[in-house]
Amino acid sequence: MPNCKTIAICNQKGGTGKTTTTVNLGVGLARLGKKVLLVDADPQGDLTTCLGWRDNDSLTTTITDKLSGVIREDHTDPQSGILHHEENVDLLPANIELSAMEMMLVTAMSRETILRSYLSKVKDNYDYVLIDCMPSLGMVTLNALAAADSVIIPVQAQYLPAKGMTQLMQTIGKVRQYINPSLRIDGILLNIVDNRTNLAKSTADALRKNFGSVIKIYRSSIPMAVKAAEVASKGVSIYKYEPSSPVARAYDEFAKEVSADGRKKERLHSADAR
């Protein structure tokens, strides 16, 4: 699609629910009629297994092959190897082979923009590309940030996340300065929120105090729930596994919020083009 938006789901801290957010935001956008490609950019392959491809080591084509193809200037079909999930999202899968790509990228020409080069060949088929980043800053994560139009940051509602957020802001700032000047932060998603405590409110207050003047805190927040943890092993989204749950309703609202933000930006771009 001409106005395809690429979003990196990113946080350098682990355990913040990046993969779950990628799955459920992606399916939520698909439920709104959007064409969505999910990209697994983590050698652990959690996004791939969460969507039902548990034996990801047996996959014949993964993101590693696509990145290698760009480096080798291979002209095979860019759509080959993209998997289609029953909930109307596509997946570029990953497995442990992606770990070796870190070393290959170090010596590659234009090493930070290999993923961007690949996605440029397929993104016109989609409204959204969502990249599930690994919880560390390596060459693959830099490629994800270089390829992205924007970043969504899931933050677990825990005591004072400001230190980790500051490190992430510095990383994004460097990527913007040296690699991708148009990269922006769409917002912070409060995730795994335990509504039985005041911790979520304290976390939100701390985030607003430290970052609220420059970064949006999404109105939607995702509650902690056993069902949300269970669904990761079921190969489907929360919408399919427990459609009437509070978590499904929360992700539905979040997807609508992200989609509405996208429409606002499209209108601004249209106005600027006149």
Which stretches of residues belong to each language-model region?
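P-loop NTP-binding core
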Residues: 1-274
